[in-house]
Amino acid sequence: MANKHFDVVVVGGGPGGYVGAIRAAQLGYKVAIIERAKMGGVCLNWGCIPSKALIANAELMEKLAEQEEWGITTGEVKFNWKKVIGRSRDVAAKLNKGVEYLMKKNKIEFINLHAKIVKAGPKIEIELRDCDLQEELTPSPVKVNKVKETITCGKVIIATGAVARDLPFAKFDGDKIWGAREAMNNTDRPEKLIIVGAGAIGMEFGYVYKNFGTEVTIIEMLDRLVPVEDEQVGKEMTKIYKKHGFNIKVKTGVLDVDSSGKGVKVTVAPMGKDGKPDTSKKEVLEADKVLLAIGVGGRYDGLFDDSLGLETVRGHIKTDYVPLSDTTPSEPKPLDYKTNLPGVYAIGDVIGPPWLAHVAAEEAVLCVERFAFKEGKAKHDPIPMDYTVIPGCTYCHPQVGSVGYTEQALKAQGLKKGEDYDVGVFNNGALGKAIATRHTDGFVKIIRGLPRGEILGTHILGDQATELIAEMTLARRLEATTEEIIATVHAHPTMHEAVHEAALASEGRVINS
């Protein structure tokens, strides 16, 4: 019997994969999507969406803890942790079914098997196998069984995402040494939790567990929380988290994790001037669990036959995409997202930072539209993505929303404040809506270029920051100036007024501060 043949096969059913599959189907290709777990990928099932459900619960707990200040009395506040976790799992399940429906609607064949590419183009061969997948564990270990069938295609898009990194001396064990999946699915809340890494994952889970009564310690090797953000944001966030009762250890390295006893013992030491932990000052921290949130690498192990010679770079699949550097300004350019193998493309987390779901989805669309245009199936060449106009969001409280360059990145490029750029900052404590809603932590910071006033970067710390950043993302995409932000009437009273005031501040004419 002849193998099934498709025009396009997408491997990976996350926000990059399923969006790319839909766009290919819209353009007239015969499409299949291979996902060995559940449709929606990590984002929908184990990341972005269920974590926001947990954060919504934590926000409610935070409000209830402040009930006296709101003039409300409810009596003793109790919670059922299993139901809290269960609600987040229900949210994920509902959306998972929604993505499966989208595949049927767009006549995309969903193949729920493990894929291995054994032959590159022009006629790509993909072996399909059953597998035993422990989806609830980090890093989702899998046992692959014998080949069930083989399919062929003209093009394949790899959208397999990323896998969490561990430490040489601390491997995920599904019990005491956690990744995000264990933190999201654990029905026995720990009394003490140590989090290694102060990026989005560490900050968000820290916020959740702290508001449900867990004693949380966050360890970060650099000098501030959310270290990829603007330095001013990170330092202010560090102060705020300390104020709210988190145990914060910045400029601290982890030397060892001992999980042999009842709980975990984490040996740490302050970072020395040589960039290494000073072992003469080490101390041991104890907790019930430790969550490793130290970054990710591309997930492609076992996906390609070794004989194909797939090129990789720094733990990711190599394409014509090159991640941004703080020291190198970037101009948007057309990308094909092609690998070194004929007919094989790759998008999303598997090709490198910034490891964001919305970037993966956009890359998938651009990848498909680019080859479709070359084949006469799309009416125009797609507008390339500007990787300096990507909003980044962290959903702890206060939230962080950012787009464009940080001030430290501009300094690394040799730009000088007052000569090449200027900065405007407006604190939420001076904003009527923030005072009325008890959300006075944080600020809006706008960096404008000189002499024209174009938006180089915007960094928001505070309530609704992840929503407010959309305005400034569009402003940067359209090459708007602070003068145009100022000339745009912002409704009163809103948190958006802080954006308007920060634009005014960047020109030295702030009104309400």
Predicted regions and their residues:
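Glycine-rich flavin
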Residues: 2-6, 22-29, 34-189, 222-226, ...
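Beta1/beta-strand and adjacent pyrophosphate-binding region of the FAD-binding site
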Residues: 2-14, 189-199
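Flexible, glycine-rich terminal cap/loop adjacent to redox cofactors
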Residues: 9-16, 20, 25-37, 49, ...
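Short, well-ordered coil/turn residues at beta-beta hairpins
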Residues: 12, 159-160, 180, 196, ...
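Glycine-/small-residue-rich beta->alpha transition segments that form the dinucleotide
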Residues: 153-155, 159-165, 287-300, 350
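Rossmann-like NAD(P)H-binding beta-loop-alpha module
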Residues: 187-229, 356
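A conserved FAD-binding loop/helix module that cradles the flavin
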Residues: 229-230, 341, 347-409, 492-513
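Short FAD-binding loop at a beta-strand-to-alpha-helix junction that anchors the flavin cofactor
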Residues: 324-354, 452
